[in-house]
């Protein structure tokens, strides 16, 4: 605390000469030259900001000893005055940049917790499973910082961003009990199968026409159809490009794509509020204002149709869509229509992106590693037979398939910084003696953990057997029980749709490998694993591969 006091005093004392300017330069001189006065005052306070930055490990947002509240100080890079580390994190791959920063020998405990500044936002990041568990499990980290785009896109009333409290607990209970229960996930298997069948047929057609398949458009169309069926009870003919249904599907794709871009874009004014009316290169405010009425009209129209259809029924079957489930809730759980719009929109938004991208990463590794593909195909064939069709029940008996999906999530976590950070609502003391001050944004660098040689042996190798206990591997629960690999988060804010996402990815990978032999066409460059981080971690170059049907029909 003494150090914190000294730091604070030095920052205040640094401005002394701003008040001595009249004596130094002469009051008459300054009054006669107002521009000189303004420049001198600006220089004085800029000097104070530089001195505060120089005395603040973690950068300008950590001035006045914020990182030294506990017995163990929180160290970190200073970055630049005013801006902190914003330039290092606003472009490129921030998970890799933070990983490199945390390995700085000048801060030996930075892997546990590292302080840094994103403009005026004080932040910490953990690259250590034990400290990450403390952060994700502590009740004072139950809230999320609400960025401008999330607030304007209605997410403040949805599960992901709603502040902890009675309303958020209601949403979490609805999600776990009514929307994503194991029974309801199982009941939606026919929809997952239908979407996979349509996807495989479309891939077979593209292979026949062009000699190769670009997987991402097919995966995204199937994922959107799948989540639309689960949430709204609607599916579209992905092979049709005309008609009212095709127009509606295109409208939905457009809204989801725009939402992805807005929520995934780095908005400088979230961290430098004084820039809000000066610099908005992504036009966040204008685009959000244009998108929200479209979303509200679309979702309210779906709710209205469901209300009309449900006049004679008040209960929801296990395979009912989410709209029917929400409309069937008892009075004490019933949501206002505006809140239903927010919750349903978030389901569509979050359920489309991750499923498609994880499946693409998985297939990229299958194509890159012929031995993995051969073993996976043998397991699928043994469980299903030559002319069968993999089911959820079959998938549950395929340990190597599950290991391939886990290894994909380890090598390419879809949210390398666990997507959305946490916000400290009170000072939080950690077991290592560090104290995270209230108002601090806390992150977990899951990518750094899954690529740490002290956590995972040979982390750069793609080795599914590391998750097969009978072969000496680890029995890891990826749903938040083990912070060595927690791609869906952990604690109170763990992703509510994790079971649905895992069920979809594993089933679709099984069907893709069962239906086709996958390989690179002659003359093609090797599969590139270069990344780009938008809302999720994507392949920079979409996967394109040849897909030879293994049977007369691909589906």
Curated annotation (Swiss-Prot):
Q: What happens when the gene is disrupted?
A: Plants double the number of leaves, and leaf size and plant height are reduced to about the half that of the wild-type. Some inflorescence branches are converted into vegetative shoots. Late flowering and excessive vegetative growth.
**Binding of heme: at which residues?**
495
Instruction: Please describe the organ and tissue distribution of this protein's expression.
Output: Expressed in seedlings, shoot apices and young panicles, but not in mature leaves, calli and roots.
Pfam families in the record, alphabetically? p450 (PF00067)
What this protein needs as a cofactor is:
heme
Topology of the protein relative to the lipid bilayer: Single-pass membrane protein
Glycoprotein as UniProt keyword: no
Q: Which InterPro entries match?
A: Cyt_P450, Cyt_P450_CS, Cyt_P450_E_grp-I, Cyt_P450_sf, Cytochrome_P450_78A
PROSITE patterns, from UniProt? CYTOCHROME_P450
Principal localization reads: membrane
The molecular function GO annotations come to: heme binding; iron ion binding; monooxygenase activity; oxidoreductase activity, acting on paired donors, with incorporation or reduction of molecular oxygen
Q: What does this protein do?
A: Involved in the regular timing (plastochron) of lateral organs formation. May regulate the rate of leaf initiation and the duration of vegetative phase. Seems to be redundant to the function of PLASTOCHRON2, but to act in an independent pathway.
As for family, the record states:
Belongs to the cytochrome P450 family.
Q: Please identify the protein, giving its name as recorded.
A: Cytochrome P450 78A11
Question: What species is given as this protein's source?
Answer: Oryza sativa subsp. japonica (Rice)
């Amino acid at each position: 605390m003494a150090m914190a006091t000294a730091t604070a005093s030095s920052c205040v004392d640094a401005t002394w000469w701003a008040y001595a300017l009249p004596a130094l330069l002469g009051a008459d001189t300054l009054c006669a030259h107002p521009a000189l006065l303004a420049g001198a005052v600006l220089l004085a306070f800029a000097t104070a900001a530089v001195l505060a930055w120089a005395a603040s490990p973690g950068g300008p947002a950590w001035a006045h000893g914020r990182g030294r509240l506990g017995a163990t100080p929180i160290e970190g890079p200073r970055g630049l005055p005013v801006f902190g580390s914003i330039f290092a994190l606003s472009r490129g791959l921030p998970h890799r940049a933070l990983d490199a920063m945390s390995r700085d020998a000048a801060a030996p405990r930075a892997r546990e917790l590292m302080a840094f500044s994103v403009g005026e936002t004080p932040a910490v990041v953990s690259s250590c499973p034990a400290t990450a568990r403390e952060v994700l499990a502590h009740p004072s980290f139950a809230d999320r910082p609400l960025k401008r785009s999330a607030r304007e896109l209605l997410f403040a009333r949805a599960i992901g961003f709603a502040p902890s409290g009675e309303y958020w607990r209601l949403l979490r209970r609805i999600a776990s009990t009514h929307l994503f229960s194991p029974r309801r996930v199982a009941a939606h298997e026919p929809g997952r199968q239908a979407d996979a069948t349509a996807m495989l047929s479309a891939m077979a057609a593209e292979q026949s026409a062009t000699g190769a398949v670009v997987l991402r458009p097919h995966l995204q169309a199937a994922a959107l159809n799948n989540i639309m069926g689960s949430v709204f009870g609607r599916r579209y003919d992905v092979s049709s490009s005309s008609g009212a249904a095709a127009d509606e599907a295109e409208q939905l794709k457009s809204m989801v794509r725009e939402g992805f871009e807005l929520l995934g874009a780095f908005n400088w004014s979230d961290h430098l509020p004084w820039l809000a009316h000066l610099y908005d290169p992504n036009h966040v405010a204008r685009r959000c204002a244009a998108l929200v009425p479209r979303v509200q009209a679309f979702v309210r129209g779906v709710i209205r149709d469901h209300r009309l259809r449900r006049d004679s029924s008040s209960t929801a079957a296990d395979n009912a869509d989410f709209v029917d489930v929400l409309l069937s809730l008892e009075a004490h759980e019933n949501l206002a229509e505006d809140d239903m719009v927010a919750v349903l929109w978030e389901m569509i938004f979050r359920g489309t992106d991750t499923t498609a991208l994880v499946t693409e990463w998985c297939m990229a590794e299958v194509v890159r590693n012929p031995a993995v593909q051969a073993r996976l195909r043998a397991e699928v064939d043994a469980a299903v037979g030559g002319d069968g069709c993999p089911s959820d029940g079959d998938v549950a008996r395929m340990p190597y398939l599950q290991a391939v999906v886990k290894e994909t999530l380890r090598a390419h976590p879809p949210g390398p910084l666990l997507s959305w950070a946490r916000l400290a609502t009170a000072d939080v003391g950690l077991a290592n003696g560090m104290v995270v001050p209230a108002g601090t944004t806390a992150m977990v660098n899951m990518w750094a953990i899954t690529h740490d040689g002290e956590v995972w042996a040979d982390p750069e190798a793609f080795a599914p057997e590391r998750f097969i206990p009978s072969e000496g591997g680890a029995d890891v629960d990826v749903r938040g029980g083990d912070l060595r690999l927690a791609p869906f988060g952990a604690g109170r804010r763990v992703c509510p749709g994790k079971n649905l996402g895992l069920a979809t990815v594993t089933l679709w990978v099984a069907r893709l490998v069962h239906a086709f032999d996958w390989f690179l066409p002659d003359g093609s460059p090797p599969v590139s694993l270069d990344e780009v981080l938008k809302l999720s971690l994507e392949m920079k170059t979409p996967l394109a591969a040849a897909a030879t049907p293994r049977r007369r029909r691909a589906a």
